A protein has these predicted regions:
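Electrostatic, structured charged patches in enzyme active sites and in nucleic-acid/phosphate-binding
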Residues: 1-148
């Protein structure tokens, strides 16, 4: 079982339709975006089951040169039986940062490290999903706030 370390900005989600939730409790959201996704899964009639951080994926961290474990944000199954592993990330973490403006060297190194780490995790997640017949998707603020 995954050990959980609580951070000050974490928030617990309590489902309105607990019969749809197939994960462990408490449901911890590490961002308002994750909380919004929980609400969407919980209230969307096409979602028949969902969980938070319910899958454990081994991946190779190319920066630390070792294997690590990745817990994607969500799993969801829809009425059509399509299954997804879903990660919620800021758009800025989805591309290699470009040096512009007054960004410090330290900031650039951290952003590059985040991008590379995400690339490693997502590569493993795509293979994991392929093996299970699932689809892996990353949702960014552009997806979350489209049409709002």
């Amino acid at each position: 079982m995954k050990k959980y370390k609580k951070n000050k900005n974490d928030r617990e989600y309590i489902p309105s339709y607990p019969e749809k939730y197939c994960g462990t409790y408490p449901i911890i959201c590490r961002s308002s975006w994750e909380y919004r996704m929980c609400e969407w899964f919980d209230h969307n009639k096409s979602v028949i089951e969902w969980s938070s951080e319910g899958h454990r994926i081994k991946y190779f961290d190319t920066l630390r040169v070792k294997y690590r474990i990745y817990y994607p944000d969500f799993y969801a199954m829809f009425k059509n039986r399509n299954k997804f592993i879903i990660e919620v990330k800021p758009q800025k973490d989805m591309r290699m940062p470009l040096k512009k403006g007054g960004k410090s060297h330290k900031t650039m190194m951290m952003r590059e490290s985040t991008f590379i780490n995400n690339r490693d995790k997502f590569k493993a997640a795509k293979q994991y999903c392929k093996n299970l017949g699932y689809e892996f998707i990353v949702i960014t603020e552009k997806d979350l706030f489209r049409g709002n």
